[in-house]
Curated annotation (Swiss-Prot):
<dbReference type="GO" id="GO:0008270">
    <property type="term" value="F:zinc ion binding"/>
</dbReference>
<comment type="function">
    <text>Catalyzes the hydrolysis of the adenine ring of phosphoribosyl-AMP.</text>
</comment>
<keyword id="KW-0862">Zinc</keyword>
<comment type="pathway">
    <text>Amino-acid biosynthesis; L-histidine biosynthesis; L-histidine from 5-phospho-alpha-D-ribose 1-diphosphate: step 3/9.</text>
</comment>
<keyword id="KW-0479">Metal-binding</keyword>
<feature type="binding site">
    <location>
        <position position="77"/>
    </location>
    <ligand>
        <name>Zn(2+)</name>
    </ligand>
</feature>
<dbReference type="InterPro" id="IPR038019">
    <property type="entry name" value="PRib_AMP_CycHydrolase_sf"/>
</dbReference>
<keyword id="KW-0460">Magnesium</keyword>
<feature type="binding site">
    <location>
        <position position="78"/>
    </location>
    <ligand>
        <name>Mg(2+)</name>
    </ligand>
</feature>
<keyword id="KW-0378">Hydrolase</keyword>
<dbReference type="GO" id="GO:0000105">
    <property type="term" value="P:L-histidine biosynthetic process"/>
</dbReference>
<comment type="subunit">
    <text>Homodimer.</text>
</comment>
<keyword id="KW-0963">Cytoplasm</keyword>
<dbReference type="GO" id="GO:0000287">
    <property type="term" value="F:magnesium ion binding"/>
</dbReference>
<feature type="binding site">
    <location>
        <position position="76"/>
    </location>
    <ligand>
        <name>Mg(2+)</name>
    </ligand>
</feature>
<comment type="similarity">
    <text>Belongs to the PRA-CH family.</text>
</comment>
<dbReference type="GO" id="GO:0005737">
    <property type="term" value="C:cytoplasm"/>
</dbReference>
Length: 123
């Protein structure tokens, strides 16, 4: 089976990554990865991303302990977006929710907060 890694299409050095829980298929988050982050994700088995706001590579859960163990990586038909299916430890969202998609466009919170963000990052 061919390895599509070399043919991935990055825009301004980044590729979008959608993250889903491997068991429930709940969408957990959306992030960007650069080539180094994708390579580290593949070699370590844990999700790595590139933060546009901090302009740096980061391993999900490095500070919080809320790691994302990779179960499978899928690439879309245009080879310009990735899907990480993960085993999530703790919360995916830095605001303490299981998913970053915890509210509607109207502002209604539709998921329970699992952790206080102050407790997550006070380690």
């Amino acid at each position: 089976m061919p390895d599509l890694f070399p043919s991935l299409k990055y825009h301004d050095g980044l590729i979008p990554v959608i993250v889903q829980d491997a068991k429930t298929l709940q969408v957990l988050m959306f992030a960007f990865a650069n080539e180094e982050a994708v390579s580290l994700t593949r070699s370590t088995g844990y999700a790595h991303y590139f933060s546009r706001s901090r302009n740096k590579l980061w391993k999900k859960g490095e500070e919080s302990g809320h790691l994302q163990k990779i179960v499978r990586i899928c690439v879309d038909c245009d080879e310009d977006c990735l899907l990480y299916l993960v085993e999530q430890t703790g919360c995916a969202c830095h605001e303490g929710y299981a998913s970053c998609f915890f509210r509607t466009m109207e502002g209604e919170v539709i998921l329970p907060r699992l952790k206080d963000p102050a407790d997550i990052y006070s380690r």
